Amino acid sequence: MSADRRPLVLIVDDSSHVTGPLQILFEETGRRVVIACSVATAVRACEAERPDLMLLDLSLPDGDGLSVLELLAGAPALPPVTVALTGHDDPLTVQRCRAAGCRDVLLKPVPVRDLLRRASEWLPGEAAASSPNG
């Protein structure tokens, strides 16, 4: 297990146009990043890495992104904070995400400043973890 105490963000999306910029953004602001592009790889990443935050696209090649939460329900590998990323802002989608356990639902594309501000709210302990000796 890594001694690196920086917050770990799991980005689950099958588009490199989404994951690439998000990875750069989070790494430049002191977080570690793991990328998953499917339900199956997201579940494996949660089990292996235990992320602090999961940004979860709802449309994945092997199923509904919310099925990641269903597959990990009650397991220690379930991230403490999951945020849904979607291109659909209809009330039913938001309701489904909240019912599945998502802390927040963000409409893509997410403004960078908004995402950084919210990430600081979702990861309250990251200030100490981002110190040079952290």
Model-derived segments and spans:
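Short amphipathic alpha-helix used as the core "switch/output" element in two-component signaling
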Residues: R44, L66-A77
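As written
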Residues: G65, R98-R103
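Active-site residues of response regulator receiver
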Residues: D57, T86
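Acidic catalytic/metal-coordinating carboxylates
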Residues: S38, D64-S67
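Acidic, metal-coordinating helix/loop segments flanking the phosphotransfer/catalytic sites
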Residues: I35-L53
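Two-component/phosphorelay signaling modules centered on CheY-like receiver
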Residues: S16-V34
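The feature encodes the CheY-like receiver
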Residues: P61, D90
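C-terminal output helix
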Residues: L92, V110-A119
